[in-house]
């Protein structure tokens, strides 16, 4: 995950992951973000896309995932908790959005333990594994559309 990785869902939104810190000690940590277009919420699209991204990051050997959510946003918090994220803390009045300061919630998910191996850059992943992962979640997205 040396560079930001982004997954687009047609015209419905995107999700991406990027390094959370530059120091080598944090090579196995990533921050996730997701944006969904209006009308897409509440249909399982966000959960499906984030689950796919998490699986791809696990294939790369990442261990700790973090998500930052501008508050209030209970739907996003619930979705991430369903995926196994836990509350990690709140930064108060730290995000400027919509002409005002907002609290920002941090959530975390651990997807591995023990001594890590070097992270596998996305382009070095086995193409077959990537395609299997993407197909699994595309099938789920297609079910959402039906």
Per-segment meaning from a language model:
Residues 20-32, 41, 59-64:
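A conserved beta-turn-beta hairpin within the catalytic core of GNAT-like acetyltransferases
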Residues 28, 93-143:
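C-terminal "cap" of GNAT-fold acetyltransferases
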Residues 32, 67, 107-109:
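A structural signal for short, well-ordered beta-strand segments
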Residues 10-19:
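Conserved beta-strand in the GNAT
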Residues 1-11:
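Single conserved hydrophobic/aromatic residue that forms the stacking wall/gate
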Residues 36, 42-59, 64, 74-82:
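Conserved acetyl-CoA-binding loop-helix of GNAT-fold acetyltransferases
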Residues 16, 66-69, 81, 86-103, ...:
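Conserved catalytic-core motifs of GNAT/GCN5-like acyltransferases
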């Amino acid at each position: 995950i040396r560079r930001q990785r982004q997954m687009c869902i047609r015209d419905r939104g995107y999700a991406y992951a990027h390094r959370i810190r530059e120091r080598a000690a944090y090579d196995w940590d990533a921050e996730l973000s997701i944006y969904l277009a209006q009308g897409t919420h509440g249909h399982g699209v966000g959960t499906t896309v984030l689950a796919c991204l998490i699986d791809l990051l696990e294939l790369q050997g990442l261990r700790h995932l973090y998500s930052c959510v501008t508050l209030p946003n209970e739907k996003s918090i619930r979705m991430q908790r369903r995926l196994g994220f836990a509350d990690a803390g709140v930064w108060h009045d730290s995000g400027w959005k919509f002409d005002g300061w907002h609290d920002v919630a941090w959530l975390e998910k651990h997807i591995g333990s023990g001594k890590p191996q070097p992270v596998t850059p996305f382009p070095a992943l086995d193409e077959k594994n990537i395609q299997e992962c993407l197909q699994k979640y595309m099938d789920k997205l297609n079910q959402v559309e039906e």
